[in-house]
Regions:
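Juxtamembrane/disordered regions of integral membrane proteins
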Residues: 1-137
Length: 137
């Protein structure tokens, strides 16, 4: 399968993983970090979900493109789901993991949000990596 189609499918999978993590797993205590709508207006989730979907598709495309370029340099040879997860985790560790851990040192009030970001991005990247590893040959 071509990398761009695999990237779009991985973006959709990442979107659903992200929706699950932020909608079902990380719900307690996150109200402190939300900007409330003006008084008397409901929360309009449509535009936010749309932006998240577009960003997830872009993320999937970038992940698939980078995976295709670097798949021969991975420890897991021959591609496959484990290679995709390895690639995703290798990208996650020096970027998102260290960033959220480092920010948690200074911004102690935001630590619950940073911990949620830490774990949700690990799940999101591994789901997308699994899909890309399965589909890109």
């Amino acid at each position: 399968m071509s990398w761009w189609l695999a990237g779009l499918i991985a973006g959709v999978a990442a979107y659903f993983a992200d929706y699950f993590m932020w909608g079902k797993v990380f719900t307690k205590g996150m109200d402190l970090f939300v900007t409330p709508p003006p008084a008397g207006q409901p929360v309009n989730m449509g535009p936010m979900l749309g932006k998240s979907a577009v960003l997830s598709l872009i993320f999937g495309l970038l992940l698939a493109w980078l995976y295709r370029r670097f798949m021969l340099a991975l420890w897991v040879s021959g591609g496959g789901p484990l290679a995709g997860m390895e690639f995703a985790t290798v990208l996650w560790l020096p970027t998102i993991a260290l960033s959220t851990l480092g920010s948690g040192i200074w911004y102690d009030r935001a630590r619950p949000l940073l911990n949620a970001t830490f774990w949700s991005w690990l799940v999101r990247m591994n789901v997308a990596g699994l899909v890309v590893g399965l589909l890109v040959k």
